[in-house]
């Protein structure tokens, strides 16, 4: 495979030397290279190489400016129809240029230009089953995915994909989060993504059921970073993370824990052929590249919303953190505040359905809000029997087939969107629910906010009415853990570098007295979160009622 002439002579020479060095390394490791392909980014600085050894085992590496930042790493998976872990043969690859533009109502930039190179590598396993390995190279990172071809159902038994990270001159550091909290705050049965960030050394195990995506590797301080995550996950697959016990610098893909979602749902993904696995995303560069990259969105499918004029980001008053949901009268005070200060939304959180004559009360609040130029959003439990918090209601209304009826009803009232909580699992059945909610919400023009949920996986490009995800150790932990707990100033910087780098983050910022009392955060730090943390809906967590002695009115 030759590098396209558009990269110029220097890029071709560097890419050729990288491929030669990679092939020699494969030979020295005892796996004689018999086939190789190379794909370069448009600027020629970033390359991903794939080789097959004598046993038909595939591996890849990634280099930037001639420096290897992901060493020889395993590829492949085993399903009931395919075995791509050995005995694989490659056919002639095809390459195409990527040049796309799209607009986003949320995120790091509203106008996006996607330039990249894509290579499709046809494969056959030892039994003749056909598949493809699809590679992408962009200036800010690379990605790859498997495309299983054929007919009938295929269940994926294991995925061998790994990321072999080199140890830098001063020791590679790993910024990550445990997927779950063990027997502490978030048990494995409750799912994860809400634990505080941790800094580990390369190869150090994590005492939970995996490293949550995204995980950031600092190979050279201030200069060379590798961030690993996923994109374009659909109902054909499950959510994944990195195994809790790396093999030196090799970090492998891990499927969900059986206990997630209260043990309901299958761990192993199963889908009718043909189907694609999610993109395995590797952002490469300095810290600015990591923070500014939109690669997770860029790799996802284009928007399915024909007219996005109803998708309006904004600020939201929200009583749950400071005063619970309370009464309709309390929510009326929050509507008054939002109108007075020009905020676009008010979120009515859990247990609104337990009000006396709840549906009429909500409709009355909608009328009041509309008269003030404010829109309302409603909270829902995602469960269902999978939720670990069945006392938090409304319950069972976000499950098919009743979900569409519920959405049609509240859209008719004039509700602008929904917050759906307590998914508690990355299993395939929950991925189906995530996508089902987004598809149905599109039809009724409802904005969506996912809490107790998985990380952003590029869905915001495909479904731009998905305004934000939680998946962060956010401000609510001052409430849950109490004095002496909750995010520190350092953690908040880490959130911006790690979690917020892959998509909108509903941290629920700007709590004043409780953050100051808990971990000593000055008011200026809390206020800065509203700018530092990107979220399509920014839910301000402190009090916004009529009391002028506390909360935002006091400030």
Identify the function of each model-found stretch.
Residues 2-15:
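Bacterial N-terminal signal peptides that target proteins for export
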Residues 14-25:
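Bacterial N-terminal signal peptides
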Residues 27-297:
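N-terminal accessory beta-strand-rich subdomains and adjacent acidic, glycine-rich linkers
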Residues 121, 540, 545-555:
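Glycan-recognition and catalytic regions of carbohydrate-active enzymes
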Residues 146, 338, 421, 448, ...:
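Conserved, mostly hydrophobic/aromatic
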Residues 272-284, 288-345:
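An acidic-aromatic substrate-binding cleft motif
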Residues 349-517, 522:
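Aromatic- and carboxylate-enriched substrate-binding clefts and catalytic-loop regions
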Residues 515, 528-538:
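Catalytic domains of carbohydrate-active enzymes that cleave complex glycans
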């Amino acid at each position: 495979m030759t590098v396209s002439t558009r990269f110029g002579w220097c890029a071709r020479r560097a890419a050729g030397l990288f491929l030669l060095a990679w092939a020699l390394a494969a030979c020295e490791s005892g796996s004689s290279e018999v086939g190789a392909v190379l794909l370069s980014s448009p600027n020629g600085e970033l390359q991903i190489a794939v080789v097959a050894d004598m046993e038909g085992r595939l591996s890849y590496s990634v280099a930037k400016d001639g420096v290897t930042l992901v060493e020889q790493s395993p590829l492949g998976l085993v399903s009931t129809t395919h075995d791509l872990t050995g005995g694989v043969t490659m056919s002639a690859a095809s390459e195409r240029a990527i040049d796309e533009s799209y607009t986003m109502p949320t995120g790091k930039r509203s106008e996006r230009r996607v330039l990249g190179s894509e290579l499709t590598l046809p494969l056959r396993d030892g039994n003749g089953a056909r598949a493809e390995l699809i590679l992408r190279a962009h200036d800010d990172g690379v990605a790859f995915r498997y495309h299983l071809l054929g007919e009938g159902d295929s269940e994926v038994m294991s995925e061998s994909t790994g990321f072999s990270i080199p140890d830098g001159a001063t020791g590679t550091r790993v910024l990550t989060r445990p997927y779950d909290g063990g027997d502490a705050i978030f048990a494995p049965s409750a799912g994860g993504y809400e634990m505080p960030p941790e800094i580990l050394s390369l190869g150090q195990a994590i005492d939970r059921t995996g490293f949550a995506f995204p995980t950031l590797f600092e190979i050279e301080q201030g200069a060379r970073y590798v961030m690993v995550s996923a994109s374009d996950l659909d109902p054909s697959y499950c959510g994944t993370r990195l195994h809790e016990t790396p093999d030196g610098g090799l970090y492998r893909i891990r499927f969900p824990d059986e206990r997630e979602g209260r043990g309901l749902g299958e761990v192993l993904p199963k889908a009718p052929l043909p189907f694609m696995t999610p993109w395995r995303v590797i952002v490469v560069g300095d810290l600015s590249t990591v923070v500014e990259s939109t690669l997770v969105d860029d790799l996802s499918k284009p928007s399915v919303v024909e007219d996005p004029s109803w998708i309006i980001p904004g600020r939201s008053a929200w009583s749950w953190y400071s005063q619970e949901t309370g009464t309709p009268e309390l929510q009326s005070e929050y509507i008054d505040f939002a109108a007075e200060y020009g905020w676009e939304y008010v979120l009515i959180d859990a247990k609104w359905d337990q009000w006396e004559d709840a549906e009429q009360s909500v409709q009355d609040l909608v009328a009041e809000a509309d008269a003030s130029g404010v829109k309302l959003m409603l909270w829902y439990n995602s469960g269902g029997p999978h939720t670990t918090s069945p006392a938090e209601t409304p319950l069972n209304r976000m499950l098919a087939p009743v979900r569409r009826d519920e959405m049609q009803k509240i859209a008719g009232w004039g509700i602008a969107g929904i917050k759906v909580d307590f998914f508690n699992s990355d299993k395939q059945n929950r991925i189906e629910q995530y996508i089902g909610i987004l598809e149905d919400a599109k039809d009724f023009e409802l904005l969506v906010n996912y809490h107790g949920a998985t990380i952003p996986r590029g869905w915001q490009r495909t479904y731009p009415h998905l305004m934000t995800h939680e998946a962060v150790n956010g401000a609510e932990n001052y409430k849950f853990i109490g004095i002496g707990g909750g995010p520190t100033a350092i953690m908040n910087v880490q959130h911006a570098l790690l979690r917020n780098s892959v998509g909108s983050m509903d941290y629920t910022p700007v709590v004043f007295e409780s953050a100051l009392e808990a971990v000593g955060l000055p008011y200026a730090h809390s206020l800065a979160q509203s700018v530092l943390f990107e979220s399509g809906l920014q839910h301000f967590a402190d009090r916004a009622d009529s009391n002028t002695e506390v909360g935002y009115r006091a400030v």
